[in-house]
A protein has these predicted regions:
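An acidic-aromatic
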Residues: 75-124
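Flexible, processing/modification-adjacent segments and terminal tails
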Residues: 104-157
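Gly/Pro-enriched, hydrophobic low-complexity segments
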Residues: 139-199
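Extended lipid/amphipathic-ligand handling interfaces
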Residues: 67-70, 91-93, 166-170, 197
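Sec-dependent bacterial lipoprotein signal peptides
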Residues: 1-29
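Bacterial Sec signal peptide processing site at the extreme N-terminus
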Residues: 21-44
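Post-signal-peptide N-terminal segment of Sec-exported extracytoplasmic proteins
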Residues: 44-83, 88
Length: 199
């Protein structure tokens, strides 16, 4: 029974780690460089509300979850649930700091996402980037490359040791419905995102 509980905790921890690594990227401890132009700045900060599913693998741990991510005006809120709908955590962040809250009422607060993941998971996970990567853009502050498909849409983005591969449901759809993120440095990780709703 104890081994089963440990395995279950391991899966939830791996899934939460992946979600934390991928979520809430607007609040960072880095000072970003200025965007190339006003249009890029607007796109980088544009609000969105997405819902979908993810699966994550890091080392021998893996897990899956559903998520709803709301991003607006430098504030983010991510609700994580098991595939059967059981709440895993709510993650929130803004300029004042970041928080993780579990269903049993436990709350952990930190100044940055790196600090929060270090305290809750035992390892600092870089969380800058995903809000830009979702839109097929390299995040400001570090070099990145974007390869485009025949329709001019992002096909592969590489930045910060991550490779993000975009898949589209058809040739006419401008936004990717599936993203595969691979990290090959240090502890390799792979995260697959399926976006069911994007507003």
């Amino acid at each position: 029974m104890r081994a089963g509980r440990c395995a279950s905790r391991s899966v939830i921890r791996a899934c939460a780690a992946a979600c934390l690594a991928l979520a809430l990227c607007a609040c960072t401890s880095l000072t970003p460089r200025e965007p190339a132009n006003v249009a890029d700045a607007a796109a980088a900060g544009a609000p969105f509300d997405i819902a979908g599913r993810l699966s994550a693998r890091r080392g021998t741990d893996g897990g899956s979850a559903s998520f709803v991510w709301r991003h607006e005006g430098g504030a983010d809120e991510v609700d994580l649930a098991t595939p059967l709908g059981q709440t895993l955590a709510r993650l929130t962040g803004d300029a004042a700091g970041v928080r993780a809250q579990w269903p049993d009422g436990r709350t952990v607060e930190a100044r940055t996402w790196d600090e929060l993941t270090e305290r809750t998971l035992g390892v600092a996970i870089p969380v800058q980037g995903l809000s830009a990567w979702l839109r097929g853009r390299a995040r400001a502050g570090t070099p990145g490359t974007v390869e485009r498909d025949a329709q001019g849409r992002p096909a592969v983005l590489r930045q910060d040791g991550w490779e993000i591969v975009y898949a589209y449901p058809d040739d006419a759809t401008p936004k990717a419905s599936r993203l595969t993120l691979r990290y090959e440095q240090g502890q390799p990780a792979e995260v697959r995102l399926i976006i069911d709703r994007w507003q």
